[in-house]
């Protein structure tokens, strides 16, 4: 997830995943909304807010969540806590906004004074409620009950009763569907900058297992096993880093700032690494197929002679195949030659080979979200 300036390139892949999830759900006849939740970083907040609600409607988030822990204790208020600023950021937003996490625990027991604003006039016209973090008490001390796993009994703490009281006192204003007249404006996509390392108009390609398998079937030099050990993976990573430092690996690379995504960038790390090893094999006129620390093999007659054919394979959502935005080199493994341009130094937001940024996208499906909210409401109604 994009948690700071340096990790903003991950936003492109998260938005692509939203696009693909929505397309898949649509094909299955489902209309479950898919949203995104940010971590309330002041340096990238507005770029994220705008990015996930701009451009192609099929790629936009269906709702936007903010994980916020600013309102700490009863001495803070709507203005001093920073909630006012967050609310202003979402004014005129065209998709629902939710506090996907709230409940600062710097002052305990928590009394949840922010609920008066969240469900009152301060925020009620902008936010569609929120989710308190969290139910069970863990090491981080955010829970409202203590649980012993294997025991069905729970022990409520003061936070539980305080949250129950705050929710009971909340008086959210309802509105009839006929009176709902949205006045929001579509967001403008952010441009690449020192704090935003993404070309917003271009998204990574939808993964295609068939395309990646076809590519693997075209290689004349590859690994003996598709499942590399940890030691092999480390050795391969170093080898691919060296290879892609000497020659263009644009087919397995991406540059989010320029909006370039290789045709095989969505393949798994082993497949992308095999592509690079094969590229090196071709560059050496098939003289050597080896990676120190990993078992490799040569294939005298690959099943697929031309990688360009692989680009016609359907993606995993079922869409017809097409080349990615990258215009990098696509080579045949059997007997073709490969262009060996030296790669440009990578800018922030670019990556190649088998090394990939470990970022987990924070996407939410509204269906479980609605279930959670309903369960919470039932919980406090009953107890």
Predicted features along the sequence, with ranges:
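Extracytoplasmic/secreted proteins, especially bacterial periplasmic and envelope-associated proteins
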Residues: 13-16, 20, 85, 113, ...
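Substrate-binding cleft of secreted/luminal carbohydrate-active enzymes
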Residues: 111-178, 272-277
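Glycan-binding loop/region signatures in secreted carbohydrate-active enzymes
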Residues: 141-153, 190-218, 238
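A recurrent domain-boundary module in secreted/ectodomain proteins
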Residues: 158-204, 297-326
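Secreted/extracellular ectodomain signature
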Residues: 201-343, 349
């Amino acid at each position: 997830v994009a948690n700071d300036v340096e990790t903003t390139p991950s936003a492109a892949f998260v938005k692509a995943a939203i696009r693909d999830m929505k397309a898949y759900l649509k094909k299955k006849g489902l209309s479950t909304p898919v949203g995104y939740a940010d971590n309330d970083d002041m340096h990238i907040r507005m770029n994220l807010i705008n990015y996930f609600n701009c451009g192609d409607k099929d790629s936009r988030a269906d709702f936007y969540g903010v994980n916020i822990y600013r309102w700490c204790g009863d001495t803070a208020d709507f203005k001093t806590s920073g909630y006012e600023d967050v609310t202003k950021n979402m004014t005129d937003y065209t998709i629902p906004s939710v506090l996907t996490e709230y409940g600062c625990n710097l002052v305990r027991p928590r009394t949840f004074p922010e609920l008066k604003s969240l469900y009152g006039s301060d925020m009620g016209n902008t936010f569609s409620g929120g989710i308190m973090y969290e139910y069970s008490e863990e090491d981080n001390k955010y829970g409202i009950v203590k649980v012993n796993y294997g025991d069905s009994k729970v022990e409520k703490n003061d936070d539980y009763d305080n949250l129950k009281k705050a929710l009971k006192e909340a008086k959210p204003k309802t509105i009839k569907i006929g009176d709902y007249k949205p006045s929001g404006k579509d967001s403008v996509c952010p441009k690449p900058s020192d704090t935003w390392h993404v070309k917003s108009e271009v998204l990574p390609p939808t993964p295609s297992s068939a395309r990646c398998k076809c590519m693997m079937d075209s290689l004349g030099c590859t690994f003996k096993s598709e499942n590399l050990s940890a030691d092999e993976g480390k050795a391969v990573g170093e080898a691919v880093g060296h290879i892609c430092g000497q020659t263009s690996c644009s087919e397995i690379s991406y540059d989010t700032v320029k909006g370039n995504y290789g045709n095989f960038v969505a393949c798994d790390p082993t497949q992308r690494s095999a592509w690079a090893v094969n590229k090196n094999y071709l560059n050496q006129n098939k003289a050597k197929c080896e990676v120190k620390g990993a078992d490799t093999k040569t294939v005298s007659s690959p099943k697929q002679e031309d990688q360009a054919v692989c680009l016609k394979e359907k993606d995993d959502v079922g869409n017809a195949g097409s080349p990615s935005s990258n215009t990098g080199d696509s080579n045949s493994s059997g007997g073709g030659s490969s262009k060996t341009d030296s790669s440009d130094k990578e800018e922030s937001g670019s990556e190649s080979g088998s090394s990939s940024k470990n970022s987990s996208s924070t996407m939410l499906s509204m269906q479980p979200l609605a279930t959670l909210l309903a369960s919470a409401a039932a919980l406090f109604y009953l107890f």
